[in-house]
């Protein structure tokens, strides 16, 4: 993680301005030129360019602009080839009228004493002293501190949001992995082995045979009782509720702990004998149901022929 530089680290040192005098006079834009230091080489988010964009979005970029131009003015003032008149023109046009004068386009929040010094220089057509310009720069740096703290907070917030989103997706993956591995911690393998041991006797085919034989026997008994009590009951009504018996058999098969059902089928016979006494007992569709229907039809035919005789 990149370290957070101080405000001085990103403001100083500035490159020496290599523009000509004519360019300095005609320039109305801010040119923030920094020597690429450690934070620039490391592509740090804390750069002067990003700080300036942050201030510009907040409509408070005037302090940073004044700092840059005042620093350039001091560098220009060290050039002995520049005349006093030229320095005065650059100061008044690029700094005083734009950032210091009352109701200027980008008026900075200077103290009354500092403003009076510059107003006096402007009225007397004098170039301000270096010490006065340095005091103004120092004051502006104090004003920039608040904006820089907000800038650093915004960068950290963005970095935290990105990190949180990444950690959130990683946490979801961890939860998935944890839920997958938690089954083994509950001993599912042991449960599966125990369940398989119950299903060994009898096997699937043997169990199906027991169920079919039991169902067939119960069907014959049910046919007799139903023909005696309700001979007019149609086969279509028997088909409508066949799923009830099927679901009952399925629920019985889903209880491997009942070894009596799986080993001998006695428990299943008892349940079927109890269920067959109910008038609503119906057989499932398929081979058993067709066999039941054929027996009912044959029985009805026999009764009709007997009555005709």
From Swiss-Prot:
Tell me if Glycoprotein is a UniProt keyword of this record. no
Q: Which controlled-vocabulary keywords does the entry list? A: Cytoplasm, Nucleus
Note the Gene3D superfamilies from the entry.
Regulator of G-protein Signalling 4, domain 2
Task: Give the UniProt subcellular location, in the record's own words.
Answer: Cytoplasm; Nucleus
- Result when mutating residue 63 to S: Decreases the ability to suppress glucose-induced cAMP signaling when overexpressed
GO term, biological process aspect, one? adenylate cyclase-modulating G protein-coupled receptor signaling pathway
Record's GO cellular component terms: cytoplasm; nucleus
Q: Does the keyword Nucleus apply?
A: yes
Where in this protein does the record put region Disordered?
213-264
Pfam families given in the database record: RGS
Q: Which GO terms describe its molecular function?
A: GTPase activator activity
Q: Which residues form the RGS domain?
A: 37-161
Tell me what happens on changing residue 144 to H.
Answer: Abolishes the ability to suppress glucose-induced cAMP signaling when overexpressed
Which residue intervals are annotated with compositional bias (Polar residues) in the record?
A: 213-223, 253-262
Q: Which domain of life is it from?
A: Eukaryota
Biased segments, Low complexity type: 231-252
Q: Whom does it interact with, and what assembly results?
A: Interacts with GPA2.
Instruction: State what this protein does.
Output: GTPase activating protein for GPA2. Negatively down-regulates glucose-induced cAMP signaling via GPA2.
What is the official name of this protein in its record?
Regulator of G-protein signaling 2
Organism listed in the record: Saccharomyces cerevisiae (strain ATCC 204508 / S288c)
Source species taxonomy:
Eukaryota, Fungi, Dikarya, Ascomycota, Saccharomycotina
